[in-house]
Amino acid sequence: MKERKVIIKTGLNLENSYTSLPEIFFTRQNPNRVPSPKLAVLNYPLIAYLGLNAKVLQSTDGVDILAGNKTPEEAIPISQAYAGHQFGHFTMLGDGRAILLGEHITPQGERFDIQLKGSGKTPYSRGGDGKAALGPMLREYIISEAMNALGIPTTRSLAVVTTGESIMRETELSGAILTRVAASHIRVGTFEYVSRWGTIEELRALADYTLQRHFKKRNDKENPYLFLLQEVIKKQAELIAKWQLVGFVHGVMNTDNMTINGETIDYGPCAFMDVYDPETVFSSIDIYGRYAYGNQPNIAAWNLARFAETLLPLLHINPNEAIKIAENAISDFTKLYKNNWLSGMRAKLGIFNEELEDEYLIEDLLSIMHKYGADYTNTFRALTFDNIEDTVLGGKVEFDKWYKLWQERLTRQEESKLSSRQLMKSSNPSVIPRNHRVEEALEAAVKEGDYSVMEKLLDALSKPYAHSKEQDYYSTLPEPSTCSYQTYCGT
């Protein structure tokens, strides 16, 4: 395929260190041309952070780059190979509709993948058309930016362009391409892929590359591959705890959707929980609740065990010793996760120090919330501003008893009630991407071409801890008829 390389001063400063790996890990692939690209949304704060030129990206040439019609001169476009356990079953995968243009080096020296998602067929498309629809791309843009504002590690969304194409799914939909920005796209599934179909030398090359790119600070006397495993476990323990603290349900925690660098990736059937229920599932295909809200920590541990299995040949020359090393490392996940989660829950309740009974206090509150169908986000918001009477828990005997114990707990710390209130305000968001508000924004954009609803939503979501009056509209609960919300893997 003939390359369409151009010199356009977008500010992109691209390298592609990933192509230094053996060719088993990728295939060189140009994006498909699209007939009539138009800019739908551009992320100006992210553009500024990356040191890019917003004016040029808005131009015809800039939009052509975001659509894949033109390729920056220094780009080496590739699709990445990986495998994965999907709902527990192993399969070969790869970038079926995504092209990595390269790695942008920011003025601060940070390295970020720049990927076009929905850019056409690749060798890994497995019969698909490689295209993406506008609605799911806008949805990923909204959710990923909300996650970033909440302080949760995530891939970012730089832009969405419409392609001028119609793509066939169950109905005819408008085509679109998302420009995704990530610290990298190395997944547990990348290691599974080379473990199954590569050599030990290729596995070592990937592990060494990952260490160099993401985990440079290490004691050289340590086993570097054990260090890699331990660091990935730590990052995932932190990430999953942060998901749980805001009621985020990923929906498709396959091993190909677990990044090595600890970023949330692939926002297909994700959603935020309204009413607190550990069994909350939104994905239309997760009929057995494998990826339910309350099961996410267990699934993370399962995925990490699959990652550890890929590293066994590097952990020790003796297979039995390698298994022991891996099992010891994986056994740390539960404790690491719980410590992160407890720390976050204490903050949500204004608690600064640790007491052994804190876990019981927290679990009792969650049990009461579950019993009475309390909204997760708004309950903690009500506790923050001491207006619980406005929630379903107001006047409930069990809650009143719990509230008294909580107040007694707050008096047993040196910090003042005012300090506790400030801690709670910075730990309990006033606004999350409520499913009905996201759908409202998508419907206006996709069906009517009106992006103003989405822009207002994004503005509210960009300041989740502002607790401003203007955000009240976005914190209202859905009507009962819309509570049984289902998501589909369109991204």
UniProtKB/Swiss-Prot annotation:
Function per UniProt: Nucleotidyltransferase involved in the post-translational modification of proteins. It can catalyze the addition of adenosine monophosphate (AMP) or uridine monophosphate (UMP) to a protein, resulting in modifications known as AMPylation and UMPylation.
Residues at which Mg(2+) binds: 257, 266
Annotated ATP binding sites: 94, 96-97, 117, 129-130, 180, 187, 266
Family assignment from sequence similarity: Belongs to the SELO family.
EC number, UniProt record: 2.7.7.-, 2.7.7.108
GO MF annotations in UniProt: AMPylase activity; ATP binding; magnesium ion binding
Cofactor(s) for this UniProt protein: Mg(2+); Mn(2+)
Active site location: 256
Pfam families: SelO (PF02696)
PANTHER family in UniProt: PROTEIN ADENYLYLTRANSFERASE SELO, MITOCHONDRIAL, SELENOPROTEIN O
UniProt entry tagged with the keyword Transferase: yes
Protein name: Protein nucleotidyltransferase YdiU
Reaction catalysed by this enzyme: L-seryl-[protein] + ATP = 3-O-(5'-adenylyl)-L-seryl-[protein] + diphosphate; L-threonyl-[protein] + ATP = 3-O-(5'-adenylyl)-L-threonyl-[protein] + diphosphate; L-tyrosyl-[protein] + ATP = O-(5'-adenylyl)-L-tyrosyl-[protein] + diphosphate; L-histidyl-[protein] + UTP = N(tele)-(5'-uridylyl)-L-histidyl-[protein] + diphosphate
Signal peptide: none
Keywords: ATP-binding, Magnesium, Manganese, Metal-binding, Nucleotide-binding, Nucleotidyltransferase, Transferase
Gene that produces this protein: ydiU
Entry superkingdom: Bacteria
